């Protein structure tokens, strides 16, 4: 009886893993480009999923980049905004003061997974990295839920914010410390 239970659990786990599907961007390289750096992301669509017209992925809190430096495969369009395009049912962290990058598929021919979607790039002034979130929306391929949208979220490497992005945070912290300075000086004089 125990053997049947374990075999059933293994079979259920295998079915669950087989139906798991995502669009996954991954930082593949950072290369020097003059005084800047090109951040290259490779993206893939996994099994049981397809990319259709208007499916997309967003890299949150990327920060400043060189305008017009973006490159993407044919059939994809680039956009950036402070509040990223976000698929339903996921809650990525999105700082409203840091730019997000979104690539949207505008092609008419679905890309059936598993498949490499290509390299998506943008230039920025740093090669220092940190972790942020990405989210993606694609379409279920096959089965009783064929054609329904699938959302996923995960971690991805992005540039460390420039000092200009940190300036408001440093200003607030400095102002807070300055308000404490008179109190500190009074205590020092009385002590």
Regions found by a protein language model. Give the residues of each.
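A generic structural signal for short, solvent-exposed coil/turn residues
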Residues: 13-15, 95, 161
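Bacterial N-terminal signal peptides that target proteins for export
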Residues: 1-6
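Extracellular or exported targeting regions of proteins
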Residues: 22-158
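Sec/Tat signal peptide C-region and signal peptidase I cleavage site
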Residues: 17-21
């Amino acid at each position: 009886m125990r053997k049947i239970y374990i075999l059933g659990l293994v079979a259920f786990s295998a079915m669950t893993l087989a139906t798991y599907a995502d669009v996954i961007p991954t930082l593949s390289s950072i290369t020097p480009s003059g005084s800047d750096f090109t951040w290259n992301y490779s993206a893939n669509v996994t099994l049981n999923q397809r990319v259709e017209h208007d499916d997309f992925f967003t890299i949150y809190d990327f920060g400043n980049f060189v305008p017009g430096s973006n490159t993407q495969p044919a059939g994809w369009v680039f956009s950036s905004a402070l509040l990223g395009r976000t698929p339903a049912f996921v809650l990525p962290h999105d700082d409203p003061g840091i730019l997000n990058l979104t690539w949207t598929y505008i092609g008419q021919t679905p890309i059936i997974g598993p498949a490499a979607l290509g390299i998506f790039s943008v230039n920025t002034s740093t090669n220092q990295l940190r972790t942020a979130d990405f989210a993606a929306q694609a379409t279920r391929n096959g089965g009783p839920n064929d054609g329904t949208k699938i959302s996923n979220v995960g971690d991805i490497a992005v540039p460390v914010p420039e000092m200009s992005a940190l300036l408001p945070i440093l200003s607030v912290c400095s102002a807070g410390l300055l308000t404490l300075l008179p109190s500190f000086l009074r205590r020092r004089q009385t002590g």
